[in-house]
């Protein structure tokens, strides 16, 4: 699943390609992906001009001024822009014909992606309902509320971080990297962490997600940015996908366990419970 760095990289690519473009027509082959009114999606979007490409957590936001589309890529979603004829592909599900003759296509092998067409005034309430935490920046992700939330939760730290309520954007790849960098075992109950460990988790969340953005995201399986390019963050991962390899910090073997149904990578020496 694309995590925050991948979605931000897609956003930046789409921004370069789409700002100022007007939707002339659209086709939806998988109506279940449209989570708001299907008829409104078909009838209200033609004539709308893309004024901004924004992001909130793992959600992409196409901003038309009064209207917005909130798009979630889920497991395998990606956007492709074709300047002339669109090739046949059974995994192409949404087609946006643009005023310069190009076509923006949404591709999704799993068909899990979602689209919500909303009035911009509904955006804040939408993300409030999702209980989405702050963006992982020094300005928005404050330590004191984070510490307070950890102290009041007995959940294992990894599943807790993946809920998106404490901070937006972490997924399976980056949470493993954050906890390794913070020397915290993923199964540790949040309220059992020392305050020093809580601070390390907080600071490494910001640092590693920002590094992921700088490196254009991680291309592990199928991820590409909006320009069709691979990310490079996979070259900087320390534990994710490194089972049986030496820990970069202590040379112990990286192991993989199951936690909350997810494969979880850690160093048993550096990340003691």
UniProtKB/Swiss-Prot annotation:
GO terms for molecular function: 8-oxo-7,8-dihydroguanine DNA N-glycosylase activity; class I DNA-(apurinic or apyrimidinic site) endonuclease activity; damaged DNA binding; zinc ion binding. This is Formamidopyrimidine-DNA glycosylase. Involved in base excision repair of DNA damaged by oxidation or by mutagenic agents. Acts as a DNA glycosylase that recognizes and removes damaged bases. Has a preference for oxidized purines, such as 7,8-dihydro-8-oxoguanine (8-oxoG). Has AP (apurinic/apyrimidinic) lyase activity and introduces nicks in the DNA strand. Cleaves the DNA backbone by beta-delta elimination to generate a single-strand break at the site of the removed base with both 3'- and 5'-phosphates. It comes from Streptococcus thermophilus (strain CNRZ 1066). One of its GO terms (biological process) is base-excision repair. DNA binds at residues 91, 110. Its cofactor is Zn(2+). Monomer. Binds 1 zinc ion per subunit. PANTHER family: FORMAMIDOPYRIMIDINE-DNA GLYCOSYLASE. PROSITE patterns: FPG_CAT (PS51068), ZF_FPG_1 (PS01242), ZF_FPG_2 (PS51066). Belongs to the FPG family. The gene is mutM. The active site is at 2 (schiff-base intermediate with dna), 3 (proton donor), 58 (proton donor), 262 (proton donor). Keywords: DNA damage, DNA repair, DNA-binding, Glycosidase, Hydrolase, Lyase, Metal-binding, Multifunctional enzyme, Zinc, Zinc-finger. It catalyses: Hydrolysis of DNA containing ring-opened 7-methylguanine residues, releasing 2,6-diamino-4-hydroxy-5-(N-methyl)formamidopyrimidine; 2'-deoxyribonucleotide-(2'-deoxyribose 5'-phosphate)-2'-deoxyribonucleotide-DNA = a 3'-end 2'-deoxyribonucleotide-(2,3-dehydro-2,3-deoxyribose 5'-phosphate)-DNA + a 5'-end 5'-phospho-2'-deoxyribonucleoside-DNA + H(+). Pfam families: Fapy_DNA_glyco, H2TH, zf-FPG_IleRS. Coiled coil: none annotated. A zinc finger (FPG-type) spans 238-272. Its EC number is 3.2.2.23, 4.2.99.18.
């Amino acid at each position: 699943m694309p995590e925050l760095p991948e979605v931000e990289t897609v956003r930046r690519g789409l921004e370069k390609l789409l700002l100022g473009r007007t939707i002339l027509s659209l086709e939806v082959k998988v109506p279940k992906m449209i989570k708001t009114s299907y008829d409104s999606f078909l009838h209200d979007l033609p004539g709308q001009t893309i004024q901004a490409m924004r992001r909130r957590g793992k959600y992409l936001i196409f901003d038309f001024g009064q209207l917005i589309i909130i798009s979630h890529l889920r497991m395998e979603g990606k956007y492709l822009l074709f300047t002339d004829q669109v090739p046949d592909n059974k995994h192409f599900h949404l087609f946006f014909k643009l005023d310069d003759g190009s076509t923006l296509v949404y591709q999704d092998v799993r068909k899990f992606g979602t689209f919500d067409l909303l009035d911009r005034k509904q955006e804040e309430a939408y993300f409030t309902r999702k209980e989405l935490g702050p963006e992982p920046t020094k300005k928005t992700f404050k330590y004191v509320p984070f510490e307070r939330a950890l102290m009041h939760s007995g959940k294992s730290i990894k599943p807790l971080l993946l809920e998106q309520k404490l901070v937006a954007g972490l997924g399976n790849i980056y949470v493993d990297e954050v906890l390794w960098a913070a020397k915290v075992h993923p199964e540790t109950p949040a309220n059992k962490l020392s305050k020093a460990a809580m601070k390390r988790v907080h600071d490494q969340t910001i640092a590693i997600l920002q590094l992921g953005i700088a490196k254009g995201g991680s291309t592990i399986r199928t991820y590409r940015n909006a320009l069709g390019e691979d990310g490079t963050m996979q070259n900087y991962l320390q534990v994710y996908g490194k089972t049986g390899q030496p820990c970069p910090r202590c040379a112990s073997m990286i192991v993989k366990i199951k936690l909350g149904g997810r494969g979880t990578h850690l160093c048993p020496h550096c990340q003691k419970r």
